[in-house]
Amino acid sequence: MQEKDSKDVTMEDEETIASQEEIEVEGNSEESSKEEESNNSEISDENLSEENLKLKDENEKLKNELDAAKDRLLRLSAEYENYRNRTAKEKEGIYTDACSDVINEMLPTLDNLERAASTEGSAEDIKKGVEMVVKQFKNSLSKLGIEEIPSEGKFDPNLHNAVMHIEDEGYGENEVVEVLQKGYKRGDKVLRHSMVKVAN
């Protein structure tokens, strides 16, 4: 019986040893999993810190780019406003200069008309004075590049304005018969169309 007991004890001891080994293995695996968790936690904390630093750097970089873009936009806006103001002043200056040139050319004609109106003389003298003023005025227009639109020949709707139509076999179709009011142009720009009578 004692042998049986010693075998039993041995078996019991073996079972106890085995269970203790299992407990140790479980304890070791728990410890190793805790260590792994701790290591993983440290790694993930490091990763988060690195990621956080990267995001902060990227955020700072984007903020700087945005500030630079805002600055460029403000400068461009100011430059555009200056350009608009400058061109408006230049345009006004050009218009004023053009008006001055025209007026300076016309003033002598006005002076002569006033002199003619204030003088006493015969109708022939007055007529002669008016003809001289007309000639002076045409010279002034010529200096400004303004010329009379020729009205002979065919009717041209780009240059003429037909205010009357007549039936006359002595003229060809759409031929200008008479100029009722002269037209003028400067270069290719028509300042005033000629008012004409046209044959049908």
UniProtKB/Swiss-Prot annotation:
Keywords: Chaperone, Cytoplasm, Stress response. One of its GO terms (cellular component) is cytoplasm. One of its GO terms (molecular function) is unfolded protein binding. Residues 1-57 are annotated as: Disordered. Residues 11-29 have a biased composition (Acidic residues). It is found in: Cytoplasm. GO terms for biological process: protein folding. Its main location: cytoplasm. Residues 1-10 have a biased composition (Basic and acidic residues). PROSITE patterns: GRPE (PS01071). InterPro entries: GrpE, GrpE_coiled_coil, GrpE_head. Belongs to the GrpE family. Participates actively in the response to hyperosmotic and heat shock by preventing the aggregation of stress-denatured proteins, in association with DnaK and GrpE. It is the nucleotide exchange factor for DnaK and may function as a thermosensor. Unfolded proteins bind initially to DnaJ; upon interaction with the DnaJ-bound protein, DnaK hydrolyzes its bound ATP, resulting in the formation of a stable complex. GrpE releases ADP from DnaK; ATP binding to DnaK triggers the release of the substrate protein, thus completing the reaction cycle. Homodimer. This is Protein GrpE. It comes from Clostridium acetobutylicum (strain ATCC 824 / DSM 792 / JCM 1419 / IAM 19013 / LMG 5710 / NBRC 13948 / NRRL B-527 / VKM B-1787 / 2291 / W). The lineage of its organism: Bacteria, Bacillati, Bacillota, Clostridia, Eubacteriales.
